[in-house]
């Protein structure tokens, strides 16, 4: 993949593999490709997320998705900015993911989608959205769950890429 110009790898659930394996793989790749970025898609205990960062994951998913109230966001930011991991853990803020439609986005208007993106973009130096689901404000969940009703994981979806709205204009 790197020979084809790919320089960013999102690793799904790296915390389910041995930490020493990732330390070895990342070090080997960085010997010849030091600019390659590894994004840990790891929603796990903070200690394990820190361990992944220490062995070379350049960025990591975070719990931003579930920090909703002002006190929750302030406490989490304080943890990231002032905690011990601030020297090696690089948070990547995602308002949603391919798997997760958080409760606070469910059945909501575009305003909350834009607000959450603005928070992600200004509170972290690295943010992402899972679009087009996010870009087009898909907000219908499976009842009682944090999952999309019409998830792209289970069906082929087609989108009108000429369609614009406040999010696509950002």
Residues of each region from the PLM?
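Active-site and adjacent substrate-binding regions of carbohydrate-active enzymes
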Residues: 1-170
